[in-house]
A protein has these predicted regions:
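N-terminal targeting signals for export/organelle localization
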Residues: 2-69
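Short, small/polar residue-rich loop motifs at catalytic or cofactor-binding pockets
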Residues: 62, 86, 167-169
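Hydrophobic alpha-helical segments, especially N-terminal targeting/anchoring helices
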Residues: 69-70, 175
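Residue-level signal for well-ordered, solvent-exposed loop/turn and beta-edge residues enriched
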Residues: 74-75, 180
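Short active-site neighborhood of thiol/selenol oxidoreductases, capturing the structured segment around
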Residues: 77-107
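Structural microenvironment flanking redox-active thiols in thiol-disulfide oxidoreductases
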Residues: 101-140, 145, 152-154
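Structural micro-motif
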Residues: 143, 162-173
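Thiol-/selenol-based redox modules, centered on thioredoxin-like
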Residues: 168-209
């Protein structure tokens, strides 16, 4: 019962916000964006702009110590403590939208070319229950899903939390085996996909180090 109540309380506002951002709609061929903006600056959807709140992460720095919730186990996960493997962080506003769904399918399907030693992780502010449902329906349960649903602490600690919506900005972050951030792309126009192929190539290079 508690799970159902939590799902309803959080799920409906998140869907309405995502729809307002223009991510949802019929599936179509998605454009990939090669450009990036810095965490802590701003992103856009058409003429609308969204300031990125919080403390920006940077290349060569470690991830902040923040607890996320694993969708499958409901256990807390602190990615700053996860060393020994390359982390491929695919960060999306909401899995209940077409662009975010496409990004996650790309991670799960095209990402098979990347070594299994690279941990492919999707992070969003969807509830863990919504993430788990998506994973099962999309047949992408081999990915790890981490939820920032409580307070948006991960978004604020990385400079990736969009104002007005309080959703995470569409981005990819790669962390090397020592826990250092080595790659960041924050998509300037959130209706476009990140350059997943470039990120895959970089992840493979980091895995060989």
């Amino acid at each position: 019962m508690a799970e159902r109540v939590l799902r309803v309380i959080w799920y409906l506002p998140m869907v309405f916000l995502a729809l307002a951002l223009g991510c949802a709609g019929a599936k179509a061929k998605m454009a990939m964006e090669s450009q990036s903006v810095d965490p802590g600056t701003s992103v856009a959807r058409g003429e609308a702009r969204f300031q990125l709140l919080g403390s920006p992460v940077a290349l060569g720095k470690s991830l902040p110590a923040v607890k996320l919730v694993d969708a499958m186990t409901l256990k807390d996960v602190d990615l700053s403590q996860e060393k020994g493997s390359v982390l491929f962080l695919s960060i999306v506003p909401s899995l209940d939208t077409a662009v975010c769904e496409a990004q996650t399918h790309y991670l799960g399907e095209e990402g098979e070319k990347v070594s299994k030693d690279v941990r492919r992780i999707t992070i969003s502010r969807d509830t863990p229950f919504a993430q788990k449902r998506f994973a099962k329906e999309a047949k992408l349960t081999h990915l790890q899903y981490l939820s920032d649903y409580k307070e948006g602490e991960f978004g604020r600690a990385t400079g990736l939390l969009m104002d007005k919506t309080l959703l995470l900005a569409r981005s990819v972050v790669l962390v090397d085996k020592k826990g250092m951030i080595r790659y960041i792309q924050v998509v300037p126009e959130i209706t476009r996909l990140p350059d997943m192929e470039k990120a895959f190539q970089t992840a493979m290079e980091l895995n060989r180090e």
